[in-house]
């Protein structure tokens, strides 16, 4: 009998200690712990988590502090200033140039200082803490028709403080510019721990402050700012690129422009805007007041196609005359990769043959008619006959006088228009698919971010593109060209193997020569991603010795001992040092993989695949999707896919004390992964942490043996038949008072959980008792093998009976094959030999039947995915002696039950009563990972149900995970996120295809019913 206890706090990660290993500098730890309320973590594993960001760099920090307030930040900086210890403020760790890794005490501002403090819709402003995500800020102000204008690619996972530190922008910078324009005021902590507020201030007041006390830190800062405005104006005018997209160096041009009255009253500057782009080197921003903009009423998109990338580049400047909100480019490499992606294959297929690149042009408009007119004007001006090419037919009608706006040769071959939200989103998703496609490469050669961010005046893009291509060719490599063509920011990531010394030398040569071209063409070394380790060394070449000296003087005024994120912006970083993968990097897993890894570099390629973007850290409310449920429940870096990848790579590369099987902390970290597979589809790189977890657990079992609880849970398919034979006796342990405590003490089964109830009449018993198939084979339209998964067969035969009723109503001949299960339970416990044996038996039984024309249909989603996907890992290649062709035959002809009904439109062949009920649908994470979750929704809607599909993550039960005592708190914390979504839904009832999900949902409230499987609802609607 379950013991009722209060639900855990969603921030509670359970019984896991988030620190481990040796703690260096205990005196420093003790001193900081006395001074702050937040956590102080200087152990090996915590430092490992913060040694990387989304860049190619890796630097082990001194330690990590999770401040809870500005007072905590001030206390840390005051002490470290006195002791000469560097400090690094950090947000989401999404930096692409290495700004957020350093040998310093890291301040993780996203842990506790992450609130949207207030909003003022009338003034269109908001007050936020630095650790608040941009996505959370937008969610708070969206009901008022407002948003934070800069839209960095990872805005749901990027902190506002990080956006300020980087001076972030995004795809729509043509319309909105950079973050500095929207920072009205900032609370900052200076290097010595002084807390002050930066905002608008008269330059004359700065002069008075500087004269009043020349020895104090703040007056010295004021004095240096005044000196720069007085003495460096001409140099700033001469050396700063005349571009909106420049975030290299310090924001002195903005300061000078304000002083001159270009943004308001002359003689007044806003020091908060000097923080923009300073990368935490001048002060730590703890709070900020930011201005907001209205969400555009209407959007319209045109996709222009070109025969050559240079034609597209030539066309950018003329297109800007039409005042677009965004102009984005994709080259032929990315278009080819997108064509191989099912989601975009049809879009690419509609492009004219020979298309080498496309420009996505988006307009903001006052209404549909205005949007269509803007697109029509663009098409009339830019698409047409050049080089004897006939003008394409188009339904667009340009306004009078719109044609030949630019008097430039028309270069676009074809145009596709998108005015409805769905098609616009598809075009944008295709453009944004570029980075995930590039990052999914598992070879040692990777598309490295180091010179991807230069900003060039649009009229010089063709020359820049040609020269860049020549530089790449000289260095024996290539790159893709994509992203923000409108403001002149092409994301170009050369293919480099940083493990090879020659490639690193080529990387430096490319950066050096490209920087020369950038300076000559009047551009910036960084138009978006900042300086950091990758580009700081090129700022001197960009700005010259005099301004470089002024940068250093300003840095010294703010930070006399250079303790705030030292090395960045104007320091001595060398881009070829501190690379995550270098010539000294070593890979030794300590075990051979037990599964097939059909990717380049095998399991090593997967271990090294995470590039650190932080996509796994997105909140459910703003990010959606499945990844990563344990992070969302605990908000701990180590519980994110990125954290686990860092731990695993650290153990394998020797940066942590032991290999994965010998390091108990790493084993525990992997054990807390729920195996949802969300990262396989939601992670831009496609990191398959569930598969890596299975490998690590299997290797651990091989070395240390399998404990009793793991063996019992992993052998559930073998034990369940006995449980049903002994029912109801076998169900007594779940009903006797006090039995839960005994089970927890003896086996580690959470006392709060109700154990599965075994049915004395199994699905197979029922099927045989009714005489087997209800539709004769010779009269059937289809033949189905209903796979007897363990959950449907022994604990929930009702769903299986419903499946039989539905399939037979659609005139299917149904049989239940003689197999003992899919092997999912042992697989989820890392018992891969046992899982492989079950998979082999299933394939050997099913393959001949499928070859004779029968389809395999599975009620339980996780078992369906086992056959469709995981069998390849267990049986393909050298993993087993089962022919790959047999595995493929089974996998390609296996369906989830609702998938099968939808794929063959069986519901349209069934007489259904029109239901009036509305349903809240929670899909199974494994189906979402294989993009098969939509089938049930479509079928139920066609059947007449109203369906609200939740954009939910894992339920938290995750098979046996939620039954394990040490995981109960985490399981319920994950579940609480789902429960809140259910509570907000308007459905009359909840449906869920997963047995574990239904168990978790039943426990959301006292007396809550166990939700049915969707097929049960479909069966209930049978006439």
Labelled PLM ranges:
Residues 44-45, 102, 354-358, 422, ...:
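Short Gly/Ser/Thr- and Asp/Glu-enriched loop/turn motifs at secondary-structure junctions
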Residues 89-91, 109, 130, 152, ...:
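Active-site proximal loops enriched in glycine and acidic residues that flank catalytic Cys/His/Asp
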Residues 156, 460, 481-488, 503-506, ...:
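Secondary-structure capping and boundary motifs in well-ordered enzyme cores
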Residues 582-613, 617-720, 836-842, 888, ...:
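Ferredoxin-type iron-sulfur electron-transfer modules in oxidoreductases and energy-metabolism complexes
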């Amino acid at each position: 009998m379950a013991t009722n206890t209060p639900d855990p706090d969603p921030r509670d990660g359970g019984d896991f200690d988030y620190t481990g290993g040796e703690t260096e500098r205990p005196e420093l730890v003790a001193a900081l712990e006395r001074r702050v309320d937040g956590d102080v973590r200087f152990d090996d594993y915590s430092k490992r988590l913060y040694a990387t960001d989304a860049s190619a760099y890796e630097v082990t920090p001194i330690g990590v502090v999770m401040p809870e307030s500005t007072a905590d930040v001030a206390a840390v900086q005051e002490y470290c200033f006195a002791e000469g210890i560097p400090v690094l403020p950090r947000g989401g760790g999404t930096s692409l140039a290495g700004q957020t890794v350093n040998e310093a005490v890291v301040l993780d501002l996203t842990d506790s200082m992450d609130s949207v403090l207030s909003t003022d819709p009338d003034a269109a402003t908001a007050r936020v803490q630095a650790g608040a995500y941009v996505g959370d800020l937008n969610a708070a102000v969206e009901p008022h028709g407002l948003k934070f204008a800069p839209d960095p690619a990872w805005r749901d996972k990027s902190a506002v403080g990080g956006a300020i530190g980087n001076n972030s922008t995004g795809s729509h910078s043509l319309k909105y510019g950079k973050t500095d324009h929207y920072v009205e005021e900032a609370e900052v902590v200076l290097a010595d721990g002084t807390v002050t507020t930066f905002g608008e201030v008269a330059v004359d007041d700065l002069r008075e402050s500087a004269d009043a006390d020349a020895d104090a830190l703040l007056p010295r800062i004021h004095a240096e700012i005044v000196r720069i405005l007085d003495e460096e104006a001409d140099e700033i005018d001469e050396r700063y690129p005349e571009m909106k997209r420049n975030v290299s160096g310090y924001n002195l041009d903005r300061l000078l422009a304000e002083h001159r009255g270009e943004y308001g009253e002359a003689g007044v500057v806003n020091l908060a805007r000097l923080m923009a782009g300073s990368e935490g080197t001048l002060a730590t921003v703890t709070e900020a007041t930011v201005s907001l903009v209205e969400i555009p009423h209407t959007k319209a998109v045109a996709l222009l196609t070109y025969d050559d990338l240079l034609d597209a580049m030539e066309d950018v400047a003329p297109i800007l005359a039409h005042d677009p909100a965004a102009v984005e480019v994709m080259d032929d490499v990315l278009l080819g990769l997108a064509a191989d992606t099912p989601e975009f294959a049809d879009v690419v297929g509609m492009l004219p043959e020979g298309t080498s690149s496309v420009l996505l042009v988006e307009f903001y408009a006052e209404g549909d008619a205005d949007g269509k007119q803007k697109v029509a004007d663009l098409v009339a001006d830019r698409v047409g006959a050049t080089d004897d090419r006939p003008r394409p037919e188009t339904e667009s009608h340009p306004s009078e006088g719109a044609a030949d706006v630019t008097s430039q040769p028309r270069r676009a071959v074809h145009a596709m228009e998108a005015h409805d939200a769905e098609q616009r989103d598809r075009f944008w998703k295709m453009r944004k698919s570029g980075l995930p496609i590039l990052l999914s490469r598992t070879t040692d050669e990777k598309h490295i971010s180091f010179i991807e961010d230069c900003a060039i005046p649009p009229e010089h893009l063709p020359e820049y593109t040609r020269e860049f291509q020549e530089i790449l060719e000289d260095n024996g490599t290539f790159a893709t060209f994509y992203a923000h063509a409108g403001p002149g920011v092409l994301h170009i990531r050369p293919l480099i193997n940083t493990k090879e010394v020659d490639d690193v030398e080529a990387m430096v040569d490319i950066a050096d020569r490209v920087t020369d071209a950038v300076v000559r063409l009047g551009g910036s070394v960084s138009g978006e991603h900042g300086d950091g380790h990758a580009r700081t060394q090129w700022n001197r070449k960009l700005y010259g010795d005099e301004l470089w000296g002024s940068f250093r003087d300003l840095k010294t005024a703010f930070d006399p001992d250079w303790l705030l994120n030292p090395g960045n912006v104007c320091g001595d970083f060398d881009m070829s040092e501190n690379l995550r993968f270098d010539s000294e990097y070593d890979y030794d897993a300590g075990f051979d993989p037990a599964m097939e890894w059909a990717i380049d570099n095998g399991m090593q390629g997967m271990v090294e695949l995470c590039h650190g973007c932080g996509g796994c850290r997105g909140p459910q409310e703003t990010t959606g999707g499945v990844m990563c449920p344990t992070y969302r429940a605990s908000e701990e870096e180590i519980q994110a896919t990125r954290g686990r990848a860092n731990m695993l790579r650290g153990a394998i590369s020797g940066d942590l004390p032991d290999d994965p099987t010998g390091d108990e902390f790493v084993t525990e970290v992997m054990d807390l992964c729920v195996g949802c597979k969300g990262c396989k589809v939601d992670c831009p790189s496609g990191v398959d942490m569930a598969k890596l977890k299975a490998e690590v657990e299997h290797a651990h079992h091989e070395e240390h043996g399998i404990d009793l609880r793991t063996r019992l849970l992993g052998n559930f398919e073998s034990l369940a038949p006995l449980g049903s034979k002994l029912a109801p006796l076998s169900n007594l342990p779940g009903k006797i008072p006090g039995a839960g405590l005994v089970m927890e003490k003896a086996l580690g089964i959470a006392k709060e959980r109700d154990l599965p109830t075994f049915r004395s009449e199994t699905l197979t018993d029922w099927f045989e008792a009714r005489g087997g198939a209800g539709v004769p084979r010779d009269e059937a339209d289809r033949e189905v093998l209903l796979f007897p998964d363990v959950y449907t067969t022994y604990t929930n035969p009702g769903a299986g009976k419903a499946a039989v009723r539905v399939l037979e109503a659609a005139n299917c001949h149904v049989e239940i094959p003689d197999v003992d299960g899919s092997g999912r339970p042992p697989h989820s416990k890392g018992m891969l030999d046992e899982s492989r044996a079950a998979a082999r038996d299933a394939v050997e039984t099913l393959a001949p039947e499928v070859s004779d024309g029968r389809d395999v249909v599975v009620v339980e989603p996780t078992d369906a995915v086992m056959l469709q996907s995981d069998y390849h890992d267990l049986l393909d290649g050298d993993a087993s002696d089962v022919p790959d062709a047999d595995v493929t035959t089974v996998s390609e002809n296996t369906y989830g039950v609702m998938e099968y009904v939808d794929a063959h439109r069986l519901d349209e062949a069934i007489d259904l009563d029109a239901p009036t009920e509305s349903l809240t649908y929670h899909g199974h994470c494994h189906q979402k990972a294989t993009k098969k979750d939509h089938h049930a929704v479509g079928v139920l809607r066609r059947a007449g149900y109203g369906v609200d599909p939740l954009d939910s993550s894992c339920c938290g039960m995750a098979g046996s995970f939620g039954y394990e005592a040490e995981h109960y708190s985490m399981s319920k914390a994950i579940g609480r996120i789902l429960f809140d979504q259910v509570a907000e839904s308007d459905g009359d009832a909840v449906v869920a295809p997963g047995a574990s999900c239904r168990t978790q949902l039943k426990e959301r409230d006292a007396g809550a019913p166990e939700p049915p499987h969707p097929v049960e609802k479909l069966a209930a609607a049978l006439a």
